[in-house]
Amino acid sequence: MSLSVTRENFDEWMVPVYVPAPFIPVRGEGSRLWDQQGKEYIDFAGGIAVNALGHAHPALREALNEQANRFWHTGNGYTNEPALRLAKKLIDATFAERVFFCNSGAEANEAALKLARKYAHDRVGNHKSGIVAFKNAFHGRTLFTVSAGGQPTYSQDFAPLPPDIRHAAYNDLNSASALIDDNTCAVIVEPVQGEGGVIPATKAFLQGLRELCDRYQALLIFDEVQTGVGRTGELYAYMHYGVTPDILTTAKALGGGFPIGAMLTTQNYASVMTPGTHGTTYGGNPLATAVAGKVLDIINTPEMQNGVRQRHDAFIERLNTLNVRFGMFSEIRGLGLLLGCVLQTEFAGKAKLIAQEAAKAGVMVLIAGGDVVRFAPALNVSDEEIATGLDRFALACERLQTGGAPCG
C-alpha cells in the first residue's frame, strides 16, 4: 500500500527552495490535469514551457516504454542508438554540426560557456575570457550560469562569483557595444527573455550582436532553453530572426517532460572540447533521447509550426478581448506560444495573486516577475481548451479587479 501524502508534507520533508501550489496534480491528459480531489485544470503553464505536447502523449509514452523494455543506462563510456539518431535529427534541422547531450538547460548553458572560454583560450590566449550577458536574463542555477543571469536576487548569496562576466541592458545595442571588446570570448542572450518578463528581442538587436561578435571574434550563444523546439512558431527562434548563433542551447520542450538538454555548435568550435574536458553521467541516456527523438518527429513539421502561429493568434485575440473588459494589462507580448501579459500600474506586483486565483478557477498559468502573467501552453492545445482556459482566467481577473468572492 502506497503512502498517503498531502501538500503539507512538502513543508515537512523537502528543502524549502520552492513554494508549490496548494494542490497536488496526480493525472494529466493533453492540456488538462486533475488533482488529488479530482478537480480539473486547464494547463497553460506547461511545466514552464516543457510539456510541448501536453501530458501523457501516446507517442511519447510508446517511445519511453519501448526503450524502457530494452535498457536504461550505460554511462558515457558507451554510446547508444537513440542518442545518435537524435543528434542527427538536430544536425539536419539546424545550423549545427556537433551535439553535446546533458540533462537540463542549466547544464547546456554551462557547457556552452565553458566551450566559449576554452575556444578563446586555445585560439587566442587566456586574456580573452570576458562574457557579456544581459540584465534580468535567466540561464540556470549553477554558479556559472546564475552569475551570467544578471539577476542579483539569484546570485548574491553565493559570492564570490565567477569573474569576468558583465551585463548589458537587453535590447540595447549601445549598452552591449560598450562592453564587447577584444577580451570578450562570448555573448550569451535569450531571443526572448522568459523569466525576465517575456520580452522578445528586436531583430536589429540580435543582428547587431552577431556583427559585434564577428568583429571581436567572440562566440554568440543563443539560450533557446525556453524558446526552442517549436515554441515560437519556428523550430528554434534564431530561424524567426534570421540570425545564426555559434552555439545554441536547448532543453525543456526537447524531452516533452522527460529531462534532457543539449548544446549545439559547429565542428570548428566543438573541436576544442577534447576527451576529458567536459562530461556528464546521464546526458544522452537512451530513455531521454528516445523520447526527444519522437518529440522532434512530431514538432518539426510545417503543420505543427503553422498550428503554433494560429494558436498564437487565437490567444492574442482572446486576451485582447479580455483586456478590453478588465483593462488590467498595459501590454500583451511574446512570440508563438510564449506570451506575457504586463500588468497596469494599479495592479503592479500582483501577478502571483492572479496566478493563484487562476488556479482556483481551474487554469494554471505562470508569472515572469511580479508584473507579468506568463502563458506557455502545449503547442497542440486545442481551440476548445484555449477558450475554456481563458474563460477561467477571466474569472480570476474579475476576482482580482473587484475583490469579489474567491474562484473555485
UniProtKB/Swiss-Prot annotation:
| Reaction catalyzed | N(2)-succinyl-L-ornithine + 2-oxoglutarate = N-succinyl-L-glutamate 5-semialdehyde + L-glutamate
Q: Which cofactor does it need?
A: pyridoxal 5'-phosphate
Q: Which UniProt keywords apply?
A: Aminotransferase, Arginine metabolism, Pyridoxal phosphate, Transferase
Indicate the enzyme's highest-level EC class. transferase
Among the record's GO biological process terms, what is one?
A: arginine catabolic process to glutamate
UniProt pathway: Amino-acid degradation; L-arginine degradation via AST pathway; L-glutamate and succinate from L-arginine: step 3/5
Q: Which residues are modified to N6-(pyridoxal phosphate)lysine?
A: K252
**Domain of life according to the entry:** Bacteria
Q: Which GO terms describe its molecular function?
A: identical protein binding; pyridoxal phosphate binding; succinylornithine transaminase activity
Q: Which residues form a coiled coil?
A: none
* EC number assigned by the record: 2.6.1.81
Gene3D superfamilies under this entry? Aspartate Aminotransferase, domain 1, Type I PLP-dependent aspartate aminotransferase-like (Major domain)
What job does this protein perform? Catalyzes the transamination of N(2)-succinylornithine and alpha-ketoglutarate into N(2)-succinylglutamate semialdehyde and glutamate. Can also act as an acetylornithine aminotransferase.
Q: Which family does it belong to?
A: Belongs to the class-III pyridoxal-phosphate-dependent aminotransferase family. AstC subfamily.
Q: Which PANTHER family match?
A: AMINOTRANSFERASE CLASS III, SUCCINYLORNITHINE TRANSAMINASE
Give the protein's recorded name. Answer: Succinylornithine transaminase
Supply the source organism for this entry.
Salmonella newport (strain SL254)
